[in-house]
Amino acid sequence: MEFFWASLLGLCCSLAAANRHTVFWNSSNPKFWNEDYTVHVRIDDYLDIICPHYEDNSVPDAAMEQYTLYLVEHEQYQLCQPQPKDHARWFCKSPKAKHGPEKLSEKFHRFTGFTLSKDFKEGHSYYYISKPIHHQEDRCLRLKVMIAGKITHSPQAHPNAQEKRLPADDPEVQVLHSIGHSAAPRLFPLAWAVLLLPFLLLQIP
């Protein structure tokens, strides 16, 4: 019984500790206009990519932004060009989805044990780039993710208070036509634990 409650408490704590960092992946997001768009995370945090989305017919289908996203090495990040060996990480290819924008999520695990999954390390940086699927514009969209830890590839001597808080992408930024809002409800981690509690109690002999 004590083991059960300890496990449940550990689950609640781990869910509550994880942060979600949202990035609106489209060319009208001004954060992509800089060459060093960076998100700071910790192990077990999530990265949520919000794909381009159009809620009306003001943009021709051929001009709607659609992307293939890659997780690449630093050299490919600088060139904004994936190698043939780089497998596509995600596809943003439903710009008119009725349920709202597609959300693609990455969890920064230390070790997953799955062959096709990526293991992430503290103190390392990881790089995402995209290539357009149909539209002609070939603007480079790229993102650097730095995982907090003992070793950092790009240490800063005097990080300011804002950087210490590991900021996510600003959800209030004014992003243009390719972003919509999903009506799907979101549950906080504690709410998930409360919902799971009755089911887990039924399993106790």
UniProtKB/Swiss-Prot annotation:
PTM field: Undergoes proteolysis by a metalloprotease to give rise to a soluble monomeric form. N-Glycosylation is required for binding to EPHA2 receptor and inducing its internalization.
Annotated lipid attachment (GPI-anchor amidated serine): 182
InterPro entries named in the record: Cupredoxin, Ephrin, Ephrin-A_Ecto, Ephrin_RBD
An example molecular function term from Gene Ontology annotations: ephrin receptor binding
Keywords: Angiogenesis, Cell membrane, Disulfide bond, Glycoprotein, GPI-anchor, Lipoprotein, Membrane, Secreted, Signal, Tumor suppressor
Lipid bilayer topology: Lipid-anchor; GPI-anchor
Biological-process GO terms, alphabetical: angiogenesis; aortic valve morphogenesis; axon guidance; cell migration; central nervous system neuron differentiation; endocardial cushion to mesenchymal transition involved in heart valve formation; ephrin receptor signaling pathway; mitral valve morphogenesis
Domain Ephrin RBD: 19-151
Matching PROSITE patterns: EPHRIN_RBD_2
Compartments where located: Cell membrane
Pro-sequence residue ranges: 183-205
Annotated function: Cell surface GPI-bound ligand for Eph receptors, a family of receptor tyrosine kinases which are crucial for migration, repulsion and adhesion during neuronal, vascular and epithelial development. Binds promiscuously Eph receptors residing on adjacent cells, leading to contact-dependent bidirectional signaling into neighboring cells. Plays an important role in angiogenesis and tumor neovascularization. The recruitment of VAV2, VAV3 and PI3-kinase p85 subunit by phosphorylated EPHA2 is critical for EFNA1-induced RAC1 GTPase activation and vascular endothelial cell migration and assembly.
Family: Belongs to the ephrin family.
Protein name: Ephrin-A1
Organism: Bos taurus (Bovine)
